[in-house]
């Protein structure tokens, strides 16, 4: 960015205004849409929703580190759908109008297994997608995370809260990677006039979650169906809020189509302790299963709950599916994949 200096003061030129042609494309009926990480859990549900609009062409880029072609099998071969095996740490050259940038491992098991790859995906991957957005004049949405708030001292968390974070912890490759990704998004917006949207997504659950990915809802349901004890990490009073995947997808699409840059919290403000969640899974799925306390992992936040006032106000969005309604839908999917019939 150019700057001028006179009389000891420095002024910085404002970013260039996006061209009217760039803005006009976001109101056209035919859209070419790129979804990075589209073979993953949330990404594949987003693809399903986007493909319901017969005027959308959807391109998915995924390296299958945590995603699976099985999540997209009903669209493979469809004339409006294209699947590319691609790692976002390498540049991608496609012509698109919108970019949903979801690519990144979201489970502690996966991002602790390869922390360097995780932070490269967040930083270099986001740089590459911003470069693509700049080249083709696309609007880009980043799925950031509630993890940017760290172990919050403010509860519930609003978008204005800067967080209480550990930049060198075992989870930092993910948490700090997303914080850098948000920084890059706003820097490209200010310097190059890129149309950006940032969603801070909170814990999400539903069908197609990886069965053994280490996240608490999938852990509990898989353990219950296998007849294993539900392992609650001590002390069990730590809280999370759980958003059903269809609600999450609706929130992301409203943010993309709206005129708000964000960041905006997308999540369900219903708050549960880990013991309460385990008891709910036990009640709904396998009442005779044991609940067992185990040692906690490092850097586990004590509480997490979104303030969604902004999403309600500017997007007209709030979640509809309650936890007791969503868990049986996820149970049905897990039963099929684990081969455990309902008795």
UniProtKB/Swiss-Prot annotation:
GO terms for molecular function: NAD+ binding; UDP-glucuronate decarboxylase activity. Its EC number is 4.1.1.35. Pathway: Nucleotide-sugar biosynthesis; UDP-alpha-D-xylose biosynthesis; UDP-alpha-D-xylose from UDP-alpha-D-glucuronate: step 1/1. Pfam families: GDP_Man_Dehyd. PANTHER family: UDP-GLUCURONIC ACID DECARBOXYLASE 6, UDP-GLUCURONIC ACID DECARBOXYLASE-RELATED. It is an enzyme of class 4 (lyase). Catalyzes the NAD-dependent decarboxylation of UDP-glucuronic acid to UDP-xylose. Necessary for the biosynthesis of the core tetrasaccharide in glycosaminoglycan biosynthesis. One of its GO terms (biological process) is UDP-D-xylose biosynthetic process. Keywords: Acetylation, Cytoplasm, Decarboxylase, Lyase, NAD. The gene is UXS6. It is found in: Cytoplasm. It comes from the Eukaryota. InterPro entries: NAD(P)-bd_dom, NAD(P)-bd_dom_sf, UXS-like. The keyword Magnesium does not apply. This is UDP-glucuronic acid decarboxylase 6. Substrate binds at residues 171, 203, 216-220, 233-240, 300-304. GO terms for cellular component: cytoplasm; peroxisome; plasma membrane. It comes from Arabidopsis thaliana (Mouse-ear cress). Residues 1-22 are annotated as: Disordered.
